[in-house]
Design a protein with these regions (language model features):
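Aromatic/acidic polysaccharide-binding cleft in carbohydrate-active enzymes
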Residues: 1-74, 81-84
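Generic beta-strand/beta-sheet core signal
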Residues: 15-16, 28, 89-91, 119
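Short conserved micro-motifs at the rims of enzyme active sites and ligand-binding pockets
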Residues: 25-26, 100-102, 125-131
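Carbohydrate-binding surface patches
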Residues: 70-110, 116, 158-162
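Acidic, Ser/Thr/Pro-rich beta/coil linker or hinge segments at domain junctions
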Residues: 109-151
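Beta-strand-rich recognition/accessory modules
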Residues: 147-168
Length: 168
């Protein structure tokens, strides 16, 4: 989200570790599996194309130890004019509370929701492993709707969300 938000200055993003240790793809002698960090990069690569819109977020905040108040909701919106698609990337960082989110997208009033992808697990230390490679994976299961350009969505606590819109 941060790299997209600063796309006017950040022209390329690289992953330092592509395989093993802290990588989005882990391997062993017998197989390979995707870590949870793989999916946000996959979504950004697939759906984060176009113009990053100036996304104004009003959210409850928490106190970060060395950085003062930080919003629970982190969000960026990308408009792909060529494909007539809009994608919302959002993270609810609240560890306990789900968040009802309202977005004013009246400039896209003739768009409909294509899908709401969510990735969530109650256990923050849960991970995908060789034995359980799909423990945490994105699912098209989010709860969102759009009416006259006003989008409402329920974002689970500790969740990554991708809401895709397309012109009717």
């Amino acid at each position: 989200i941060t790299m997209l938000r600063h796309a006017d200055r950040v022209k390329i993003g690289c992953l330092a570790q592509l395989v093993n240790v802290i990588a989005p793809i882990m391997t062993s002698d017998t197989g390979a599996w995707k870590q949870t960090t793989y999916y946000p990069f996959q979504h950004a690569s697939a759906f984060g194309r176009g113009t990053v819109l100036n996304t104004i977020v009003k959210s409850p905040v928490y106190t970060a130890k060395d950085h003062g108040d930080a919003p629970y909701l982190d969000c960026v919106v990308v408009n792909n004019e060529e494909k007539e698609e809009v994608t919302i990337f959002a993270v609810n960082k609240d560890l306990e509370e789900d968040m009802d989110v309202t977005m004013d997208l009246r400039q896209f009033a003739d768009y409909k929701i294509v899908e709401h992808i969510i990735m969530h697990d109650d256990d923050l230390k849960a991970e995908n492993t060789e034995a359980d490679p799909y423990r945490i994976k994105p699912e098209v299961a989010g709860k969102s709707q759009i009416d006259n350009g006003i989008l409402t969505a329920l974002m689970q606590n500790k969740s990554w969300n991708v809401i895709r819109l397309a012109k009717n």
